């Protein structure tokens, strides 16, 4: 049985943090065992943030894959962290990489990749990709399942 006494958000009413910096990513222990590493995927198809110049909303489909070592990111804390971007002004690239770096800092995974598939503003979709290095040998990495933007196509 996993000790959940250190978790402050799971099972509790928690207000959405005012900013990503104020959000707390909590972790739970993970026993990865022998053999190829497990890959954990989080998909956030309705991610939102704000343009830092105009204040207009930006929307993205975010896919996060990581190979945990000794810790998993607790999913409610991740949800609150992701939601905290709704009032955060930053460029697409900064948001995407910030998310990846925060998860790496919290969990210290064997490997992580993040894809931010941003919906067009001004007619240009922006896709942002970041990873910590080469994927672990033997890991099963399915396609992200996000089709390239096609417009009217």
From Swiss-Prot:
Enzyme class per UniProt: oxidoreductase
GO cellular component, one term: cytoplasm
Record keyword Mitochondrion present: no
UniProt-recorded Gene Ontology molecular function terms: preQ1 synthase activity
Residue sites binding substrate per the record: 73-75, 92-93
InterPro entries in the cross-refs: GTP-CH-I_C/QueF, NADPH_dep_7-cyano-7-deazaG_red, QueF, QueF_type1
Pathway linked to the protein: tRNA modification; tRNA-queuosine biosynthesis
Active site: 51, 58
Keyword terms, alphabetized: Cytoplasm, NADP, Oxidoreductase, Queuosine biosynthesis
Swiss-Prot/TrEMBL catalytic activity: 7-aminomethyl-7-carbaguanine + 2 NADP(+) = 7-cyano-7-deazaguanine + 2 NADPH + 3 H(+)
Subcellular location: Cytoplasm
Any GO BP: tRNA modification
Gene3D superfamilies (UniProt xref): 3.30.1130.10
EC annotation from Swiss-Prot or TrEMBL: 1.7.1.13
Pfam families reported in the protein's UniProt record: QueF
Family membership: Belongs to the GTP cyclohydrolase I family. QueF type 1 subfamily.
Record function comment: Catalyzes the NADPH-dependent reduction of 7-cyano-7-deazaguanine (preQ0) to 7-aminomethyl-7-deazaguanine (preQ1).
Protein name according to UniProt: NADPH-dependent 7-cyano-7-deazaguanine reductase
Taxonomic source organism: Mesorhizobium japonicum (strain LMG 29417 / CECT 9101 / MAFF 303099) (Mesorhizobium loti (strain MAFF 303099))
Lineage, top ranks: Bacteria, Pseudomonadati, Pseudomonadota, Alphaproteobacteria, Hyphomicrobiales
């Amino acid at each position: 049985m996993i000790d959940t006494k250190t978790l402050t958000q799971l099972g509790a009413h928690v207000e959405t943090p005012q900013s990503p910096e104020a959000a707390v990513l909590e972790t739970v222990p993970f026993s990865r065992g022998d053999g190829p590493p497990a890959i954990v995927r989080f998909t956030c198809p309705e991610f939102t943030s704000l343009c830092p110049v105009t204040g207009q909303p930006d929307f993205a489909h975010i896919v996060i894959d990581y190979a945990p070592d000794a810790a998993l990111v607790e999913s409610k804390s991740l949800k609150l962290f992701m939601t905290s971007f709704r009032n955060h002004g930053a460029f697409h690239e900064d948001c995407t990489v910030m998310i990846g770096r925060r998860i790496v800092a919290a969990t210290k995974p064997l490997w992580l990749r993040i894809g931010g598939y941003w919906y067009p503003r001004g007619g240009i979709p922006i896709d942002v990709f970041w990873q910590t290095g080469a994927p672990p040998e033997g890991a099963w990495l399915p396609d992200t399942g996000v089709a390239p933007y096609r417009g009217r196509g």
